[in-house]
Amino acid sequence: NSLIVFTKNRDKKITELYLVPKQPGNYNAKKIGALNVESIVTGADYNEKLQLLVLTSTKKFTKYYLTTIKNFSLDIKQDYEMKMYEIPIGKTQVEAVKIIDNKNFWITSEDEKNSKFARLMKFSL
């Protein structure tokens, strides 16, 4: 019944997580924790049934990564097992990720000067 909002912290390379209700209205976001992802988050998806959180991120805007966090719940813990995989996309701006299942994901990127096309890719582990 809530949306998870992820922040970008370019200096500390962490992401903070906040909850807001899905219903229309004025709310204060409730901070539920932070994750040390060692990168700048550009997209995220959470599948409650799979207990899987997936993030797309970059370290220096030249390489992009997919990070999986298994057994994730909204009761933020500090001992999550995070795995980071390089996305073979080159220099472009990865914008979003959608979980298909535990090993397959849709990833989108912006249209950039050097790539000339926006991209939709299926990424498999």
Predicted segments, located by residue:
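Sequence/structural signature of beta-propeller domains
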Residues: 1-125
